[in-house]
Amino acid sequence: MKRPREPSGSDSESDGPIDVGREGELSQMARPLSTPSPSQMQARKKRRGIIEKRRRDRINSSLSELRRLVPTAFEKQGSSKLEKAEVLQMTVDHLKMLHATGGTGFFDARALAVDFRSIGFRECLTEVIRYLGVLEGPSSRADPVRIRLLSHLNSYAAEMEPSPTPPGPLAFPAWPWSFFHSCPGLSAPSNQLAILGRVPGPMLPNASSLAYPIPGLRAAPLRRAAGTILPARRNLLPSRGASSTRRARPLERPAAPLPAAPSGRATRGSHMAPLLRSPSPVSPGMVGSPAYMAVPAPRPSSPGLAGRPAGAMLCRSWVSEITEVGAF
């Protein structure tokens, strides 16, 4: 089929008719040679789904790393599940805080691992304190073994603390003893802390080491007792009896004679009589609070004790008793 060409503006151009069928062939050659088959379309959709799944996995993995690296997100991880927007917001806040405090923006892997270890140790210590408080009940008398155990764990937590020494004094309360203020049903914190100053022994820290565990703020390192933490059985019973008697008296009581001891302690008084006759020098490590100086008065039936002064006899008897039963 041929059609006549439209007349052009110039009469000098005279071309023949144009073949329409040949134009159709040229247009088909310009198109793609073949359309995609259904199997090819299905394979393309499958590849696209795999790529999308890998992208989501990378996003979730990065969010998990942010939950572990950002301190605020790590603390809230156990309470409830954090959303992605919350994790990103906490990350932004943490980076702003680092920028405001002059941080470099890089994480020290070793310091981060030590910090996580100290956080876990403090959580375990808090759980131990809670369990021992519930197990002992609301009584005002605390076990000396429990006091020594908590003092040892507190000193070990102080050694693990990676934070540097601040220039000024601490502005926050002592830890972990502030746990007693927030837990109802436990014994009074004043009784717990007062017992710490009355229980003698090499494992008892001083007042400066009971503060928040920062190594630079402690006056001297804690001396560890040779052997196990718990005392031997032969020293446990008299020490517990002596410590329970000392806990029953207030700290402010002066060194004065008390009424006669009950009949249950007669054997113990007769056992201590040879030690009372021999003078023993007072070591500087044994000097304690005035509660250590209050002892039962000697009975008139004891021979050989009437001719000695009352003050010297009280001091020497108490020091000899501590020397025999051993510092708990």
Curated annotation (Swiss-Prot):
The lineage of its organism: Eukaryota, Metazoa, Chordata, Craniata, Vertebrata. InterPro entries: bHLH_dom, HES_HEY, HLH_DNA-bd_sf, Orange_dom. Disulfide bonds: none annotated. Downstream effector of Notch signaling which may be required for cardiovascular development. Transcriptional repressor which binds preferentially to the canonical E box sequence 5'-CACGTG-3'. Represses transcription by the cardiac transcriptional activators GATA4 and GATA6. Self-associates. Interacts with GATA4, GATA6, HES1, HEY1 and HEY2. Interacts with HDAC1, NCOR1 and SIN3A. This is Hairy/enhancer-of-split related with YRPW motif-like protein. Belongs to the HEY family. Residues 116-153 form the Orange domain. PANTHER family: BASIC HELIX-LOOP-HELIX TRANSCRIPTION FACTOR, HES-RELATED. It is found in: Nucleus. Residues 43-98 form the bHLH domain. The keyword Lipid biosynthesis does not apply. Residues 1-54, 236-272 are annotated as: Disordered. Transmembrane segments: none annotated. It comes from Bos taurus (Bovine). Keywords: Developmental protein, DNA-binding, Notch signaling pathway, Nucleus, Repressor, Transcription, Transcription regulation. Residues 42-111 are annotated as: Transcriptional repression and interaction with NCOR1 and SIN3A. One of its GO terms (molecular function) is protein dimerization activity.
